[in-house]
């Protein structure tokens, strides 16, 4: 089982900024896509099924007419399950949660450090993972992308991966609208 959540208090960006002025804006397309992409990459397989629901409680008295929070359950082609939440309203620090629950090890992305569990039980201990979070600046991957356009090189993330993660996000939005 794997979980990835995009948690970022940016209500002002969707109620007062350009996102809220668009004919349509989906929080999964703008935020959650990053965790969905990461989970696909870590699992090395495709998501074959989604079910989703969302809420608009924090934005109900604003001009923003779309859901600010969407939670989805995912099923991978080999049977693994997952969960992703995109929430643009939590009162907390920005965080990209990633939890991987395995039968041999479990990884929990946390602050101030991640946790790696090698054993289970009541008196379980964990190894602190002290790698920097987020580990790179926001624009660090742009040079490769720009180079791939200018020099017609193959980018680190190709169009097939982009379209596959977008297909999952479209499926999440459709499931949310249909309440399935």
Q: Model-derived features: where do they sit?
A:
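Secondary-structure boundary/capping signal
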Residues: 46-47, 51, 80, 153-154
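NAD(P)-dinucleotide binding in Rossmann-like oxidoreductases
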Residues: 60-67, 76-141, 158
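Conserved glycosyltransferase catalytic-site signature
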Residues: 36, 66-70, 159, 166-169
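A generic structural signal for residues located within well-ordered alpha-helices
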Residues: 31-34, 137, 160, 164
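Phosphate/oxyanion-binding loops and surfaces in catalytic or ligand/nucleic-acid-binding neighborhoods
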Residues: 42-46, 103-107, 169-176
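A general structural signal for well-ordered alpha-helical segments in protein cores
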Residues: 35-36, 138-143, 169
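Predominantly a Rossmann-like dinucleotide-binding segment in NAD(P)-dependent oxidoreductases
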Residues: 1-64, 72, 179
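C-terminal helix-rich "cap/oligomerization" subdomain common to oxidoreductases
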Residues: 77, 144-180
């Amino acid at each position: 089982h794997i979980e990835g959540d995009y948690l970022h208090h940016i209500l002002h960006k969707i109620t007062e900024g350009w996102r809220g002025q668009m004919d349509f804006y989906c929080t999964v397309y703008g935020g959650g896509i990053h965790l969905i992409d990461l989970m696909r990459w870590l699992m090395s397989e495709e998501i074959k099924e989604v079910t989703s629901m969302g809420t608009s409680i924090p934005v109900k008295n604003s001009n923003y007419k779309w859901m600010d929070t969407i939670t989805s359950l995912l099923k991978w082609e080999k049977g693994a399950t997952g969960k992703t939440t995109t929430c643009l309203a939590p009162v907390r620090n920005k965080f990209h949660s990633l939890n991987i629950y395995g039968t041999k090890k479990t990884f929990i992305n946390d602050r101030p450090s991640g946790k790696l569990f090698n054993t289970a039980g009541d008196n379980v201990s964990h190894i602190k993972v002290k790698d920097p979070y987020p580990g790179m600046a926001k624009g660090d991957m742009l040079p490769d992308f720009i180079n791939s356009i200018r020099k017609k090189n193959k980018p680190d993330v190709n169009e097939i991966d982009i379209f596959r993660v977008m297909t999952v996000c479209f499926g999440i939005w459709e499931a949310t609208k249909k309440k399935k």
